[in-house]
C-alpha cells in the first residue's frame, strides 16, 4: 500500500504548486499534526485516499475548524485495506496549550486502549505527533518523546511508528528512519 505521510510543514509541491503526480497511486494519507486544516482539506479534493490525522501541539484551531473530509483517529484504531492504524496525538506538556500531555497522562491514554489493542491483535502503524522517548526526540521539554510510546513499541511491535514534531528543519543530520525493537 502506498501511503503519503505528512507532518508539521505543508509541502509546496502539494499545496502551492500542486503536482498531481505526487498523489498518483496514494491509497492512504496520514497526518502527524501541526498542519493547517485548509491544507488537509485541499488535499481531499485531489485524491480518493482517506486522510487520517492526529493533533499536533499547535492544532487547537481544529476545535473551531477541523480539516473537512478528513478523519481524526485520536485514541482509535482505524483499519484501511487491512492495515491497522492507532492515533495518539499531542506533545509533551510544556505550556498551557491544547494537545499537550505529561508522561503520566500519555501513559494513561495508552493504558485505556488495551482492550481495543487486544481485540484488534495489535496495530501495524502507530501514528503520533511526538516521538518516542530517546528515539528521535530532543532534550528540551517541548520536544521530548513519550516513554509510553517506547513501551508501546516494545510491547506491541507495530511495523511503523510515524511521528512529526521533531524534523529535519531542526538540524541537517536528523535521521528520518530508525529501528527499535523491530519497529
PLM features per residue range, with description:
Residues 44-45, 50-59, 64-69, 138-183:
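Conserved beta-sheet core of the metallophosphoesterase superfamily
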Residues 5-7, 28-33, 50-56, 126, ...:
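Short, hydrophobic beta-strand segments that form beta-sheet elements in well-ordered domains
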Residues 5-14, 55-144:
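Conserved catalytic scaffold of divalent metal-dependent phosphoesterases
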Residues 14-20, 37-41, 71-73, 111-115, ...:
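A generic local structural motif
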Residues 1-46, 118-122:
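N-terminal active-site segment of His-dependent metallophosphoesterases
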Residues 1, 83-84, 159:
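Secondary-structure boundary/capping motif
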Residues 34, 131, 166:
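Flexible loop residues that form catalytic
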Amino acid at each position: 500500500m502506498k501511503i503519503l505521510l505528512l507532518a508539521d510543514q505543508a509541502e509546496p509541491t502539494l499545496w502551492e504548486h500542486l503536482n498531481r503526480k505526487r498523489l498518483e497511486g496514494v491509497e492512504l494519507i496520514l497526518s502527524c499534526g501541526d498542519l493547517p486544516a485548509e491544507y488537509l482539506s485541499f488535499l481531499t479534493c485531489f485524491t480518493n485516499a482517506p486522510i487520517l490525522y492526529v493533533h499536533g501541539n499547535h492544532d487547537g484551531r481544529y476545535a473551531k475548524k477541523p480539516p473537512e473530509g478528513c478523519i481524526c483517529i485520536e485514541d482509535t484504531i482505524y483499519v484501511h485495506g487491512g492495515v491497522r492504524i492507532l492515533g495518539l496525538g499531542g506533545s509533551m506538556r510544556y505550556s498551557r496549550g491544547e494537545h499537550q500531555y505529561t508522561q503520566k497522562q500519555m501513559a494513561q491514554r495508552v493504558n485505556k486502549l488495551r482492550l481495543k489493542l487486544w481485540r484488534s491483535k495489535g496495530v501495524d502503524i502507530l501514528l503520533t505527533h511526538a516521538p518516542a522517548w530517546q528515539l528521535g526526540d530532543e532534550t528540551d521539554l517541548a520536544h521530548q518523546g513519550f516513554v509510553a510510546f517506547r513501551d508501546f513499541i516494545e510491547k506491541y511491535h507495530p511495523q511503523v511508528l510515524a511521528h512529526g514534531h521533531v524534523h529535519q528543519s531542526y538540524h541537517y543530520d536528523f535521521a528520518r528512519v530508525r529501528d527499535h525493537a523491530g519497529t
